[in-house]
A protein has these predicted regions:
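Patatin-like phospholipase
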Residues: 1-49, 58-410
């Protein structure tokens, strides 16, 4: 029994937070969670994949029982503080980058509107150049608290393939994340039988057969290997993770970047109120204006929320179950008149019970909290610089507050 958006208590409704993947864009989800806490919205279930899975694990297993939101923000600030700043190099190269990529034309300034457009264009240029620089920094040096390049000399003694890079299947080791997360996660909270914490669901994909892998704290002990698995994105050049003998996992975002279906499968009886964080917005207002924005928009579509069909089917199934309920009540009220044998009666009742246990949940409400994109750029999800992380956290909190306030006024 938990508070709704107006502060009233509702029985038999699960509050669910669904967190998408998206690299450094996961800081937006941190801000969203901060807003939910401030509005006293208790969560029953948290599901995530990739960086969303990392966020979810920190929230559900937080070592700070009273303020998991503060601990999650601390995690993101720690990542940003370990971002390798290459400003001295880029101070030298930036003018050339700007000239080559953005300033090889004369922008006319014949009226106030054009001046305003020019100022806005220059601002966008500066942000995009900064994101490009941040990407190069992460690619070259990694992030000590998250991932390290495999070519660093410290791996020479421990990596048997260090001197044969033609055999490499990954470029970055994200096992440093384990030590970092130990400061934030109490794994004893992420196991069956611990009902005082939100249920945690992480998703991954089996490298060999492409089937979904679901890690559910109500069914198994969640360990650091499961968090590494859900964030093992091969196109970021992270390695697969062996989660069981012979079972090798990659990032769940390869199958679905929005693990809503897994939530419905895991908890099929209790109705849901869903808060869905969209790091990659489904809808935008304008077409791309250059090839970089074309690639950016294509990526947004690939990783955007595609659960509309799941939501529609959930509602269709609810209508069917309501109809079955009506028919079943007619059956029970007239069972004696039907003169059915005991085996047939028992079979009908078993089927009725199974249908309700397997598919009884309904999505009562769903709140989409979508990140706005003022200056779209293909490298935005690799920018772990302090200013960007702080801005993402703030924008997530602001957007969540806006969505919650809008629903309260309805």
């Amino acid at each position: 029994m938990y508070l709704d958006l107006s502060g009233e208590k509702i029985a038999n409704i699960e509050n669910v937070l669904v967190l998408q993947g998206g690299g450094s864009l996961g800081a937006f989800g941190c801000g969203v969670y901060k807003a939910l806490v401030k509005h006293h919205l208790d969560l029953d279930l948290i599901a995530g994949t990739s960086i969303g899975g990392i966020n979810a694990a920190i929230i559900a297993g937080s070592r700070n029982k009273d303020r998991p939101d503060e601990l999650l923000e601390e995690f993101w600030l720690e990542l940003s503080e370990n971002f390798v700043n290459n400003d001295k190099f880029f101070d030298f190269s930036r003018p050339n980058l700007m000239k080559q990529f953005y300033e090889n034309f004369v922008y006319p300034l014949h009226n106030n509107d054009m001046i305003a457009n020019y100022v806005e264009m220059k601002k966008g240029q500066q942000i995009k150049i900064k994101q490009l620089e941040s990407f190069f920094s992460s690619a070259a040096f990694g992030n000590e608290k998250f991932f390290k390049p495999r070519w660093f000399s410290e791996y020479a003694a421990s990596d048997p393939e260090y001197f044969t890079p033609m055999k490499w299947t990954y470029l970055y080791d994200h096992k440093p994340l384990i030590k970092t997360l130990d400061r934030y996660i109490d794994y004893d909270k992420l196991r069956p039988g611990v009902n005082s914490n939100p249920r945690l669901i992480l998703t991954a994909v089996n490298v060999l057969d492409s089937k979904a892998l679901i890690f559910d704290s109500f069914k198994q002990q969640i360990e650091s290997k499961h968090i590494l698995a859900t964030s093992a994105y091969p196109l970021y050049n992270f390695p697969w993770i062996e989660v069981e003998k012979g079972v090798f996992a990659w990032d769940g975002g390869l199958l679905s970047n929005t693990p809503l279906r897994e939530v419905l499968d895991a908890s099929p009886v209790i109705d849901k109120k869903i808060f869905l964080v969209e790091n990659y917005p489904k809808a935008v207002d304008a077409l791309p204006s250059n090839i970089g924005e074309v690639h950016h928009r294509a990526r947004d579509i690939i990783f955007s929320d595609k659960t509309e069909h799941n939501i529609k089917m959930s509602r269709v199934i609810t209508r069917y179950l309501d109809f079955i309920e009506e028919l079943y009540q007619i059956f029970e009220n007239n069972a004696d008149k039907l003169q059915l044998d005991k085996n047939t009666l028992s079979k009908i009742r078993r089927k009725y019970k199974k249908y309700h246990e397997d598919h009884g949940a309904e999505i009562k409400e769903i709140y989409y909290i979508s990140r706005d994109e003022m200056y779209p750029h293909i490298f935005e999800n690799a920018d772990f610089s302090p200013d960007t992380i702080k801005e993402l956290i703030k924008s997530g909190e602001d957007k969540a507050n806006k969505v919650i306030q809008a629903h309260k006024q309805e």
